[in-house]
């Protein structure tokens, strides 16, 4: 997708906020515990390479991504730190990961059996580093049964030139919820499955951001620090208190490209779902659903000159309209996410109106929106 460098629409990334969010967590870690920065999905829309650079400066010792392509992107950018892919990678690409010392998750012996000939065909490669995924209640990927796990471990031990168990992990479904009943059930199942292993691998990890913030007593020597890097509370506001203040790193700003006066009954946008109730000033903002500012945000608001202005009419692919309190010239700043005067719109505000989570809003901001760092970290 082409980046819109020549229109007034910018995602601003506060690098110092990212630095502080990581440094505060690193300072809380138990001795010998490492922090891997989760930079999947272009670092939740914040820019993978930008965040990786700041995370490394803040004390992160490795990275987690969702797909092999993201891991290769880090290697191409000369990041030599450990990189763990969290999603299942098709077995035919196992040699690519091994050649780049990229760690992959394993959820079945079948995957190992399929990857074996791929790795045997290139005997010069180091063993593929694998992390055994344990499904303790997320229902996504991972071993669930004792015997299946034992069989996989035995297979790996029988092929030491092709595989090495570097880690074991699980993912919690409710670590961000006030009720920890299900969370504790998952902890118990994880401990049971880990105890089946002949020895503990280098990395034993269960902690995502929510677990690290609110359940620090969990066993493990590595945390997968994700959404909190970006200053977002993993629970939304279900658990409003965090051990330290999280500093939001992302804001979204634009400008008015056009302002006009309309009169009672005049229609706005597709379907004429909004008609002026009287003489009104309508401003046009050059962002639309192709940028991730979705149609469901009709009726929400943005900030102009420190005042909330309602989005009126349907949001178009590339533009939307707002009702202004008075006439403003083209070029007037419009804040979609962030502060203006004494007022603020957060990603969580946008998410609540959209009936979703703030993770999704950040990730939906498309590459067409140019990214720009503020408060840069050297």
Curated annotation (Swiss-Prot):
Binding site for substrate: 140, 317
N6-(pyridoxal phosphate)lysine PTM sites in chain numbering: 40
Pfam families, sorted: Ala_racemase_C, Ala_racemase_N
Pathway membership: Amino-acid biosynthesis; D-alanine biosynthesis; D-alanine from L-alanine: step 1/1
Entry-linked Gene3D superfamilies: Alanine racemase, Lyase, Ornithine Decarboxylase, Chain A, domain 1
SUPFAM superfamilies: Alanine racemase C-terminal domain-like (SSF50621), PLP-binding barrel (SSF51419)
SMART domains (UniProt xref): Ala_racemase_C
Enzyme class of the recorded protein, top EC level: isomerase
GO annotation, cellular component aspect: cytosol
Entry annotated with the keyword ATP-binding: no
An example molecular function term from Gene Ontology annotations: pyridoxal phosphate binding
EC number: 5.1.1.1
Necessary cofactors: pyridoxal 5'-phosphate
Keyword list, A-Z: Isomerase, Pyridoxal phosphate
GO terms of biological process kind: D-alanine biosynthetic process; peptidoglycan biosynthetic process
Catalytic activity: L-alanine = D-alanine
Active site: 40, 270
Its biological purpose: Catalyzes the interconversion of L-alanine and D-alanine. May also act on other amino acids.
Family the entry assigns: Belongs to the alanine racemase family.
Stated name of the protein: Alanine racemase
Organism: Lacticaseibacillus casei (strain BL23)
